[in-house]
């Protein structure tokens, strides 16, 4: 608990009462919420923040955007995967230097660190990025760091140190590839719960990855460093309503000192003159 003058200053800056158990922590519903993240992390008020609303009419076709090489992501025979509830998301940790992504007009090779999910409380919201003002039900982020660095932590404050592949997720047919994750959500009901799961073939989780949007942005959670090359894929992942509901159910299972794990997404940030490009030609009437 903060006391005396420190408490007064904190209230003036954040509008949050000092007795809150979430003081000095960021969150989506408690503590320092997204609109005030800049109080704790000044970078969150930067000019190149993520996510964004991708407006198709403003996207620029770039014929030089290359296809991705994702072949290394199938090397899973002895890769351990840890599924974790970190209090802000469901995260699958996959730290292994052999899991690399090249191509995609990235400035070199990027090593996979983890992937995680953002979702809402209803099907019509949950993704962080939007397309023409529309949310998807969820969004999956594959977080990578340049192979010039040993870790995400080391790379996160360096220009182009990180690259994130973003995938929209909506409701459709049952998706067998997500079974290992869905089945184990019951084992990570509370913050800091984790479980080792069967290693996944990442490319089996992905939709078709030929077409994408590209822009320069930031981490979508504090410290919001503006070091991310963003790729948001055009094609969506589909899971069943039952599978989506298993993520929604995490919002009902928490304990004192943690927030509901639901609606864990940041709203779109201003473009501030940034250009969004794509390798989708016909979609935008380019000749």
Task: Tell where the protein language model's regions lie, with residue ranges.
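Alpha-carbonic anhydrase
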Residues: 2-287
């Amino acid at each position: 608990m903060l006391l005396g003058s420190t408490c007064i200053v904190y209230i003036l800056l954040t509008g949050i009462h000092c007795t809150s158990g979430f003081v000095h922590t960021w969150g989506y519903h408690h503590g320092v919420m997204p609109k005030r993240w800049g109080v704790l992390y000044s970078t969150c008020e930067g000019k190149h923040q993520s996510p964004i609303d991708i407006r198709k009419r403003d996207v620029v076709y770039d014929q030089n955007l290359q296809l991705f090489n994702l072949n290394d992501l199938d090397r899973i025979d002895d890769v351990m995967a840890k599924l974790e509830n970190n209090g802000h998301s469901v995260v699958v940790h996959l730290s292994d230097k052999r899991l690399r992504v090249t191509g995609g007009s990235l400035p070199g090779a990027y090593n996979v660190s983890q992937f995680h999910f953002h979702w809402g409380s209803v099907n019509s919201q949950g993704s962080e990025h939007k397309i023409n003002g529309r949310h998807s039900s969820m969004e999956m982020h594959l977080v990578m760091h340049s192979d010039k660095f040993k870790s995400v932590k080391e790379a996160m404050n360096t220009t182009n140190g990180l690259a994130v592949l973003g995938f929209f997720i909506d409701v459709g047919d049952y998706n067998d590839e997500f079974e290992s994750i869905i089945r184990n959500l019951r084992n990570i009901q509370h913050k800091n719960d984790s479980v080792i799961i069967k290693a996944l073939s990442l490319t089996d989780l992905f939709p078709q990855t030929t077409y994408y949007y590209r822009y320069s942005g930031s981490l979508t959670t504090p410290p919001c460093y503006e070091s991310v090359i963003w790729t948001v894929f055009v094609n969506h992942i589909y899971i069943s309503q039952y599978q989506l509901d298993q993520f929604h159910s995490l919002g009902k299972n928490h304990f004192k000192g943690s927030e509901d794990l639901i609606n864990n997404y940041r709203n779109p940030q201003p473009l501030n003159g940034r250009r969004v490009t794509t390798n989708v030609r016909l979609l935008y009437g380019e000749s």
